[in-house]
Design a protein with these regions (language model features):
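A residue-level signal for conserved active-site and pocket-lining positions in enzyme catalytic cores
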Residues: 11, 64, 89, 141
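Gly/Ser-rich helix-loop-strand patches that form or flank binding pockets
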Residues: 74-90
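Glycine-rich beta-strand-to-loop/alpha-helix junction loops that act as flexible
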Residues: 40, 66-69
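Short glycine/serine/threonine-rich phosphate/pyrophosphate-binding segments
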Residues: 17, 70-75
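Catalytic core of DAGKc-family lipid kinases
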Residues: 91-168
Length: 168
């Protein structure tokens, strides 16, 4: 995989994650890779942006998340659907979605550059209600209703199939 543009996403409010993001950014910059960081992470020669949504029009070769599942899901929701994400558990609680630890980053970057990897493609789930589309989800969507006195009617579409049914 040719790495030209990579964004590094750290866990909000975690100094451990922010410091790890700086380390990873420096490693990538030393390999002449263009790096984007998300504020407050700032690294010389990297391009800092205020938020992930500022990058959704840029074709990124890779996103690296440093945090827990929440950090990974935030990147997943805000980046283009074809952007691969390497997830590193740094300061996260469980890290169910994490692929590696920080100790493995050199090997992971080297493997990516040498194209000795496989991509696990995930389907995004998208929900809409009354014409308003919500951010994509990775594996589930929680539906709740305001008025509990009536049975709600749901319409679920998957590819060319549609199911419309009253459910509670």
């Amino acid at each position: 995989m040719k790495l030209n543009k990579v964004v590094i996403v750290s866990k909000f409010g975690s100094k451990i994650s922010e410091n790890a993001a700086k380390q990873v950014a420096k490693k990538l910059l030393s390999k002449k890779i263009n790096v984007y960081t998300i504020a407050p992470v700032e690294v010389d020669n990297a391009k800092q942006v205020e938020s992930l949504d500022k990058l959704n029009k840029i074709k990124l070769d890779l996103a690296i998340t440093l945090g827990g599942d929440g950090t990974t899901l935030r990147a997943f929701r805000n980046l283009r659907s074809e952007t691969p994400i390497l997830t590193i558990n740094v300061g996260g609680n469980r890290g169910i979605l994490s692929e590696i630890t920080l100790d493995d980053i050199d090997y992971a970057i080297s493997s990516i550059i040498k194209n000795k990897i496989w991509l696990d493609k995930r389907t995004r789930v998208v929900a809409s209600c009354n014409g308003k589309e919500f951010a994509p989800a990775l594996n589930e969507i929680y539906v709740n209703r305001k008025n509990l006195t009536k049975t709600a009617e749901f319409e679920i579409k998957f590819q060319s199939d549609t199911v419309k049914q009253k459910m509670d």
